[in-house]
Amino acid sequence: MSPTISHKDSSRQRRSGMFSHALDMKSGPLPPGGWDDSRRDSVGGEGDREVLLGDAGPGDLPKAPRSYRSELSSILLLLFLYVLQGIPLGLAGSIPLILQSKNVSYTDQAFFSFVFWPFSLKLLWAPLVDAVYFKNFGRRKSWLVPTQYTLGIFMIYLSTQVDRLLGNIDGRTPDVVALTVTFFLFEFLAATQDIAVDGWALTMLSRENVGYASTCNSVGQTAGYFLGNVLFLALESADFCNKYLRFQPQPRGIVTLSDFLFFWGTVFLITTTLVALLKKENREASIVKEETQGITDTYKLLFSIIKMPAVLAFCLLILTSKIGFSAADAVTGLKLVEEGVPKEHLALLAVPMVPLQIILPLLISKYTAGPQPLNIFYKAMPYRLLLGLEYALLVWWTPKVEHQGGFPLYYYIIVLLSYALHQVTLYSMYVSIMAFNAKVSDPLIGGTYMTLLNTVSNLGGNWPSTVALWLVDPLTVKECVGASNQNCRTPDAIELCKKLGGSCVTALDGYYVESIICVLIGFGWWFFLGPKFKKLQDEGPSSWKCKRNN
């Protein structure tokens, strides 16, 4: 189904191209690190300082609050940087739908799903990004500029190779391994850019206006994701363009993936050059110095947090809590494409979801603001599990309503309503987990603590989706019809069946088997482990405080 336009780390992580994908938890930047090096003049370390605009030193006179208009250029720059960040995320999210239209195996789809992991794993290299930099160039620009240059150059080069990788030349099969490596690098670079931009946002704006950073983040990445996914899939589709945008039909869409990559690669190079030359970072020695922490100390701190009994219990439970949703979230959208639903129509269904996705967190937060936010998670879980079965029924029903190669309006209305109900349950669980993570995080090390909990929450959605995709093919039973004494258990057997005049027919679709198994596992978790998960709310504050050896 349509990709969810989601909060980023999201992968938003939000996983696009699926019927619905896990929301990535927003994780704030880690405490800036110091890198002890003899070349302090050239590489930032403990002696460097970043401006937090609006801070005043002890001897300074208080200044009048800054209007957002006085920093409009910085706000617009942040917004544009987040838009650029959303482009590779959206493009990566469109590839599964394109691959599915080319009839690749679900094993290949599972392999490609590793592309969506970097945003959930960026905690592993965030301390490095925060600590190592060139002082004279700027703490954030030291990573932002080379990262975006690499993205731009890579996009332009890929524009010359993507048709071959997708199998558009000479009817070859898509090179899934090369596509996975390529877009994994895209996501890795986008996650690195996210770390740098999040950190820069805190010092680019004054304290009065720093709240606009989260708005730029949400709006910018959503817009970029929309451009790279929904808009691209629509303009790339010959059927969509011929039906809605052209007077004379053409055999291809208005844009191709290679055109799109070349255009945005050029935009990345031009804008990055302008940022490198024209935008300066705030580095006044008189401003209060940020708390810094060494790279090694940061990793030691993370390990100390994980070893705490309460945190370890949370990690184990949250890593298994989303198994029940994996078939519905990861496979349903691809199954709809397999049944003939145009991928661009599924992508466009994300558009009416945007207002709902904005309103839902505001409404749900009223119920998660109390001392027991996980109650909402527990109450929403069975409804989301039942919607997984409804998704399976929707896939089963899809070929029965197809008419002359298309689908009636009422079909899309039912799909949209199903999607909206799913979003209500998904956001209820997402917001409650975010509220719980914020509630238990040790305020003395809030950035690192919160990021760790959110990272584990993201991984709890990533690995079940990958496994769910991987298991579809092994659970599917196919029979060779028209050729005696043949089967369709392996690719070679399928080829032999066709050569002997037969055809492989699906007797039992692994998606339905998996949907039932996942729901049973999900209800088992809800019944046996759910109460233990809720009991974590009863742990005292001391259970969540990390003892640090200074």
Swiss-Prot record:
One of its GO terms (biological process) is acetyl-CoA transmembrane transport. The keyword NAD does not apply. GO terms for cellular component: endoplasmic reticulum membrane. Keywords: Endoplasmic reticulum, Glycoprotein, Membrane, Phosphoprotein, Transmembrane, Transmembrane helix, Transport. The modification Phosphoserine is found at S42. Residues 96-113, 163-175, 239-256, 322-344, 397-405, 531-550 are extracellular. Expressed in all adult tissues examined including brain, heart, kidney, liver and spleen, with maximum expression in liver and kidney. Residues 1-58 are annotated as: Disordered. Glycans are attached at N103. The chain crosses the membrane at residues 75-95, 114-134, 142-162, 176-196, 218-238, 257-277, 301-321, 345-365, 376-396, 406-426, 510-530. Belongs to the SLC33A transporter family. Homodimerizes. Acetyl-CoA transporter that mediates active acetyl-CoA import through the endoplasmic reticulum (ER) membrane into the ER lumen where specific ER-based acetyl-CoA:lysine acetyltransferases are responsible for the acetylation of ER-based protein substrate, such as BACE1. Necessary for O-acetylation of gangliosides. This is Acetyl-coenzyme A transporter 1. It comes from Mus musculus. The lineage of its organism: Eukaryota, Metazoa, Chordata, Craniata, Vertebrata. The gene is Slc33a1.
